[in-house]
Amino acid sequence: MDLFCKIDKVEIKTNPENQKFDIFYKDKYKPKKKEDFLINLNIINKLDSIIENGVSNFFISGQNDVGKYTLAKYFIEKYFENPCIIRKYTFVNNNKELIYYKSIYHYELHIDLHNCNIINLVQSFLQYIVRPNNSGSNKNVILIKNVHLLKPEILNLFKIYLDKYYNNIFIFIGKKF
């Protein structure tokens, strides 16, 4: 009795229509609808009313791991009515690198202790991503994560951009100051 068999090389054919994008574990189980959230629904209702009444800049603050980033992503996906799939990019200016994330609809800057505190680099990056004031239906969304780690000079730079480029939506996420 032969217990071994020969297996020829098999090619797996994927259907590109069914494989639109990779789904990570965290993306698969994150809340997608208002009812999926496990937090106070008043917060979600306020976000929905911000979208309905016209969007402005806002700051989401709280302790670690309470869902600030998830709320911001919910807001962006609800605002553009599409899922946001982000990719990692590198912005280079004067031999300094700044890593950021971008989707079709928005930009994300994740701040840590080692980046984003060089004012010329951040200013060049903001000049690169902000949209001038024009009459478009949707605004350009820029999400800044861990804003509490920024130096005061960089925060003042963001204030200038908030005042000057009002056709952009800045979402700041961080701990309370």
Regions found by a protein language model. Name each.
Residues 1-176:
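P-loop/Walker A NTP-binding region and its immediately flanking N-terminal helices
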